[in-house]
A protein has these predicted regions:
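SF2 helicase/translocase NTPase motor core
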Residues: 1-138
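Short aromatic/hydrophobic "clamp" motif used to bind/position activated sugar donors
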Residues: 141
Length: 149
């Protein structure tokens, strides 16, 4: 089990203690936003969480879970790309629509949107998939970004 730096403990406490449902943790790159989120999960004793992130970050999440979680945690990590979205044929005017996979359309104790700046365009299909179809049913939504817009 790795130990957090003092500044990371402050961020983790802020995530865990905040009363707001939506939070943005916007530390600079490399300061350990993943570790802070996992420490907050420990404090809140969350047993299951959904992470939506770039494909390259998925393996990092699984590695960090091993290092930082103290409670049993089922972490579901999906990339912004096709691993969490399905393409469905629509009308002749529009060749396809993008929706989250059906298994993601359920209540979640926690949704973490890692590198949330990738969802800055509210009209993009992946932003709409996350913010309209998944986030409304999550008890908590934590957006993590080292590049806030």
């Amino acid at each position: 089990m790795n130990e957090l730096f003092p500044y990371q403990k402050i961020g983790a406490e802020w995530l865990a203690d905040a009363k707001d449902r939506w939070l943005l943790l916007a530390d600079e790159p490399g300061l350990g936003k993943t570790a802070q989120a996992l420490e907050a999960i420990n404090k809140l004793r969350i047993r299951e969480a959904l992470v939506v992130c770039p494909a390259i970050a998925r393996l990092n999440w699984f590695g960090e879970v091993e290092k930082f979680t103290k409670v049993p945690l089922r972490l579901h990590a999906y990339s912004f790309n096709t691993t969490f979205m399905e393409r469905e044929t629509a009308t002749a005017k529009k060749s396809h629509t993008v929706r989250p996979k059906k298994e993601l359309l359920r209540p979640w104790p926690l949704l973490i949107v890692d590198e949330s700046h990738y969802l800055a365009n509210p009209s993009s299909q992946r932003s709409r998939a996350v913010y309209l179809h998944i986030a409304p049913y999550a008890e908590r939504v934590w957006c993590l970004s080292g590049t806030p817009a």
